[in-house]
């Protein structure tokens, strides 16, 4: 072959090879780099220049730990985005770290997985490599939770300076750990001037433990540092994780223009000074434990906020001004000094708490503070103020109450008739021009849910709903009921015709389902449990007869049990108009058995009857480590009867002294207990054992030949009412304070002893 011809062929081959090697990262348009796998992504990042856009191909990227580094410019950031926003799914064990200058990420969805590290999104690679002047926008994190309920992580951790997190959608964090945290653990992350705006913080269910905040700025260790973070125009939708929805633990932050919708807890100025809270709207909708603003520390400004329909009390009230600890350590309660609380509207709320938390330790009252031009209106004319200590250090001036009878605070308040009307923004204002300078301003902007988050991802209602699906009829033919349950969809109703049903396998419940009978549908079962609730499951039983006569001769049977493993998704059980019999084949046959790291939003028993039970009805006491964790938020029993139950009717346990949760709650009304709690294996020696329950109502019941109700108060100010019960051959209830020398506040009255 001639030499020149050979050289031409070699040159052509090299050219083809170079073209093929570069095609994967060839810009489809100038500055745009399309990548379709992780190797191409790493190469694209390594070669990225200011102004470049790296696009991830549509589809699922599994087990993808994204490290996005680079140095862009103010007018030419380096961007990482989706080929089509909302069409790129980051799944499995995945996360995102940003490090560098002027970086921007958008359009991704984190779903069907969890982070293998401490954060899903982190504005740093490691402690030495932070992100500055960078932005995360239009990103979704949906139920991206570690399967171990109490394995803690953050979804978003902001480090560095001058970063922005905006128009993102975060929903369904179910494991322990704050949803979003601003971290100040080095000087390079302090005085950061971050901006957090227009985000949708979707429903966060009750965690049942400390560590369920939605947003935290700083920590107690760095709380004397300033953050200068702006939290603006975010929508907090039913963020119920714990008592602090937003926890500010640093100084000089602004929280303004946000909307809190039916969220349980408060915006808490926990640590740090000179924060401003203004133009926020709290809409409680009369939902339990919905709260407003809690004030601690120095120089806090609370102005032009609107708070309506909030039911919270104590640390969860509509407005709470705390007592402090003299010479407080950095992680306790610093005294309120120079607080300015002005031009706020508090409409139809339950509680305003001043000098809250006053005790032997928290004895430093608020001082040098102002409470001015605030509007406090309640349609029922009730005084919403509770004064726990001396409030002479607060100057009250130019405030308005509406016809409160015998108000505790008179000086600085005009007590008059106030007529309200809804304005165009949907908020209530006085119709009198004379009150135009009192309360929140009329031009207050009510943030719309649709103006937050992303436009291309639904803000769906994830609440558990029974009886919303199809009606499915089944007969007692062997296997038919089990097959119907397996094939049913969420919300379906399975209607059992009259007959005897024998189930030879455990029925796993992984969706909200109703089993409906007409009181002639009898179910027996041959395994150690009839129903097992697993993640996603909730169960309603109505009009059924359930017998344990055919169950195995084992210790520890149950009608319903939870998964033995950690459950992320809270569940509900509702039983009505049903009969449960022969639950006594062997010892400790409980109606409901639960495991550690499981949480019921509610267990409700209505108009039902239980007899011959060798265990307990509700054994919800598996969180015995005294960490403030519990198994059920609301346990409710009404209009029901219990006969010959060897264990306790209910055994609920929430140990420790942590003050971060609202539950558990226990209600027993209009019911009859006969020979309940009398078994020799009943360790509590009580008919009802409640340890650390926060709200208890036991009213208008009949107790016959049962041991005493035993209640142990552990923390906070539990609300316990035991009234109008008839006790026949039954001792009086006992209520004990385990960690306080104060006399307990339980109300025990109008009970009839026979």
Residue ranges, per PLM feature:
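Acidic Gly/Asp/Thr-rich repetitive segments characteristic of extracellular carbohydrate-active
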Residues: 27-63, 67, 464-498
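Right-handed parallel beta-helix/beta-spiral solenoid domain characteristic of secreted/periplasmic
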Residues: 27-36, 55-64, 68-120, 143-145, ...
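Short, T/G/N/S-enriched strand-turn elements that build extracellular solenoid repeat scaffolds
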Residues: 41-48, 62-71, 91-96, 270, ...
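C-terminal motif of bacterial Sec signal peptides marking the signal peptidase cleavage site
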Residues: 23-24
């Amino acid at each position: 072959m001639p030499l020149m011809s050979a050289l031409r062929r070699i040159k052509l081959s090299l050219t083809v090879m170079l073209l093929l090697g570069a095609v994967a990262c060839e810009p489809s348009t100038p500055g745009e780099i399309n990548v379709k796998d992780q190797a191409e992504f790493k190469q694209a990042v390594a070669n990225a220049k200011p102004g470049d856009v790296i696009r991830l191909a549509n589809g699922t990227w599994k087990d993808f730990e994204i490290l996005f580094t680079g140095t862009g410019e103010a007018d030419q950031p380096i961007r990482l985005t989706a080929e089509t926003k909302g069409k790129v799914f980051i799944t499995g064990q995945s996360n995102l770290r940003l490090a560098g200058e002027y970086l921007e990420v958008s359009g991704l969805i984190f779903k069907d997985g969890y982070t293998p590290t401490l954060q899903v999104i982190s504005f740093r690679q490691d402690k030495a490599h932070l992100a500055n002047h960078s932005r995360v926008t239009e990103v979704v994190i949906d139920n991206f939770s570690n399967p171990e309920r109490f394995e803690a992580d953050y979804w978003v951790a902001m480090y560095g300076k001058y970063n922005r997190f905006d128009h993102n959608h975060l929903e369904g964090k179910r494991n322990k750990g704050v949803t979003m945290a601003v971290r100040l653990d080095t000087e390079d992350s302090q005085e950061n001037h971050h901006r957090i705006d227009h985000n949708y913080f979707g429903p966060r269910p009750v965690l049942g433990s400390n560590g369920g905040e939605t947003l935290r700025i700083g920590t107690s260790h760095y709380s004397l540092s300033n953050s200068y973070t702006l939290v603006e125009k975010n929508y907090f939708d039913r963020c119920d994780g714990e008592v602090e929805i937003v926890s500010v633990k640093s100084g000089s932050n602004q929280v303004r223009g946000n909307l809190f919708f039916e969220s349980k807890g408060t915006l808490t100025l926990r640590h740090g000074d000179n924060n401003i809270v203004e133009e926020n709207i709290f809409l409680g909708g009369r939902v339990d434990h919905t709260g407003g603003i809690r004030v601690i520390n120095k120089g806090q400004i609370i102005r032009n906020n609107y708070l309506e329909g909030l039911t919270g009390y104590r640390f969860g009230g509509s407005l709470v001004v705390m007592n402090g600890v003299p010479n407080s350590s950095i992680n306790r309660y610093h005294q309120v000094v120079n607080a300015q609380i002005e031009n706020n509207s508090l409409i139809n709320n339950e509680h305003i708490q001043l000098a809250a938390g006053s005790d032997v330790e928290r004895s430093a009252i608020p001082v040098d503070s102002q409470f001015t031009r605030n509007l406090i209106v309640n349609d029922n004319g009730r005084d919403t103020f509770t004064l726990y200590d001396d409030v002479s250090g607060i100057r009250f001036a130019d405030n308005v109450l509406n016809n409160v009878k015998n108000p505790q605070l008179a000086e600085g308040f005009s007590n008059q008739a106030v007529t309200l009307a809804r304005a165009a923004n949907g908020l209530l204002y006085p119709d009198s021009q004379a009150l135009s300078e009192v309360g929140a301003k009329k031009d207050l902007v009510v943030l719309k849910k649709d103006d937050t988050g992303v436009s291309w991802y639904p803000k769906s209602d994830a609440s558990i709903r029974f009886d919303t699906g199809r009606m499915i009829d089944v007969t007692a033919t062997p296997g038919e009921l089990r097959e119907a349950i397996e094939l049913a969809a969420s919300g379906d109703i399975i209607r059992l015709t009259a007959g005897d049903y024998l189930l030879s396998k455990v029925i796993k419940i992984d969706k909200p389902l109703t089993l409906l009978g007409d009181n002639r549908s009898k179910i027996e079962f041959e395994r150690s449990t009839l129903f097992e609730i697993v993640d996603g499951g909730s169960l309603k039983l109505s009009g059924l007869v359930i017998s344990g006569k055919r169950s195995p001769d084992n210790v520890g049977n149950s009608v319903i049990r939870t998964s033995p493993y950690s459950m992320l998704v809270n569940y509900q059980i509702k039983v009505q108009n049903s009969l449960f019999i022969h639950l006594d084949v062997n010892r400790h046959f409980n109606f409901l058995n639960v495991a550690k790291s499981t949480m019921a939003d509610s267990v409700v028993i209505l108009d039902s009857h239980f007899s011959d039970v060798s265990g307990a009805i509700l054994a919800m006491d598996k969180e015995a480590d005294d960490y403030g964790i519990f198994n059920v938020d609301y346990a409710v029993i009404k209009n029901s009867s219990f006969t010959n139950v060897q264990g306790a009717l209910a055994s609920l346990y929430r140990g420790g002294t942590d003050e971060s949760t609202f539950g558990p709650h226990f209600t027993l009304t209009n019911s009859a207990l006969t020979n309940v709690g009398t078994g020799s294996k009943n360790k509590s020696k009580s008919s009802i054992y409640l340890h650390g329950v926060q709200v208890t109502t036991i009213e208008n019941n009949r107790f016959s030949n049962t041991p005493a109700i035993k209640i142990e108060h552990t923390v906070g100010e539990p609300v316990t009412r035991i009234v109008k019960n008839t006790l026949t051959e039954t001792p009086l209830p006992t209520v004990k304070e385990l960690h306080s020398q104060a006399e307990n506040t339980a109300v025990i009255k109008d009970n009839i002893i026979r």
